[in-house]
Amino acid sequence: MKNKDVNYFKLQAKNLYRDYQTKQPYIDDVDGQTYYQYSPKYFDIDQLFVDYDWDEENFSLMKAQHLIANMVGFNKWADLLKAQPEELELAHLLLDNQEKIHLEDWNMYIARIEYDNRVVLDPASKLEIFKKVFLEEEGHHSPFPPYKLSQK
């Protein structure tokens, strides 16, 4: 399962970089500054660059990998590659279910469980909670739009 999940994240990083490569410069009529517009297929790249404060001028595949890792709760790509299988599966589910819960809300949800119960949850427990609460139960909707565009 680990290789499958790592390959999934590699593909997501490639897709994010492909979306970045659709950039077209334009000059704003009001301020005369050059900005970029994108024709993304996989990710809401404009929102990602704003939320994560990334430099549009110097984006690369390596930076796309780092950004994907950040989007699913890892500090860097290397941390994602070294993650336990349960952590990778949870990260995969978090990325694919952003319309149900945003990463920050998930982290707060888990922190509250740990605080209320005076425990530190292991990755397998977090994965089990995610599956039971956000996959098996209907009605969860994040107030934030997902970064990943729906593929129709």
Give residue ranges: language-model regions.
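Long, non-globular segments of proteins
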Residues: 1-152
